[in-house]
Structure formats: C-alpha cells, structure tokens
From Swiss-Prot:
Keyword Transmembrane annotated: no
Domain of life where this protein originates: Bacteria
Record function comment: Binds as a heterodimer with protein bS6 to the central domain of the 16S rRNA, where it helps stabilize the platform of the 30S subunit.
The keyword Transmembrane belongs to this UniProt entry's keyword annotation: no
Assembly with partners or alone: Part of the 30S ribosomal subunit. Forms a tight heterodimer with protein bS6.
Entry GO MF terms: small ribosomal subunit rRNA binding; structural constituent of ribosome
A GO BP annotation: translation
Annotated protein name in UniProt: Small ribosomal subunit protein bS18
GO terms under cellular component: cytosolic small ribosomal subunit
Originating species: Flavobacterium johnsoniae (strain ATCC 17061 / DSM 2064 / JCM 8514 / BCRC 14874 / CCUG 350202 / NBRC 14942 / NCIMB 11054 / UW101)
Primary gene name: rpsR
Family listed: Belongs to the bacterial ribosomal protein bS18 family.
Keywords, in A-Z order: Ribonucleoprotein, Ribosomal protein, RNA-binding, rRNA-binding
One matching Pfam family: Ribosomal_S18
Lineage: Bacteria, Pseudomonadati, Bacteroidota, Flavobacteriia, Flavobacteriales
Amino acid sequence: MSTIEQSAKGKKDGDIRYLTPLNIETNKTKKYCRFKKSGIKYIDYKDADFLLKFVNEQGKILPRRLTGTSLKYQRKVSVAVKRARHLALMPYVADLLK
C-alpha cells in the first residue's frame, strides 16, 4: 500500500478536520457592568489610563460582549474614547498599544 492509501484509510493525529466544530471552552461566568456595580455615573474622557481598559492593542473600542458593560455605559465609554482621541490623549490607531 502506498502512503497515500494509508493516509486515506487511517487519519493521522495531526490532521485538521474542517467539517467538525471546534470544542472551545468559553468562560461561563456572568459579566457584570462595572459602572453599575461601583455606582459610577460619569466617565471622564481625561482619564486615558482607565479608558485603555476598553480598547484593544490596535486601539479599537472593545464590544459589550467582551467588556460586560451595559448599553448605556458602553455608549458613554465610546463617546469618552472618541473625545480622548480627538484631544490627542489617546491614539486613533496603534501598532501595539499595551
């Protein structure tokens, strides 16, 4: 038997199977809005260190499903990040921000 026939009959351990779904373990814990939890009403656009928690390495604003913030405070975070970018407190685009 040639190696092609053997590989067709028996699958090797290192083969990639595209048709089967990957078993990715996700974090099952519930995410809570840190602003509601601590009672923060105003998000300061001048606090760039705090706003860096809500952007990724490229400088893009992280979505709600990753940060766990509520819709109301996600809008306030996005406005604060955009204001900080406009005043050059935060970069618009970065190669590696963190």
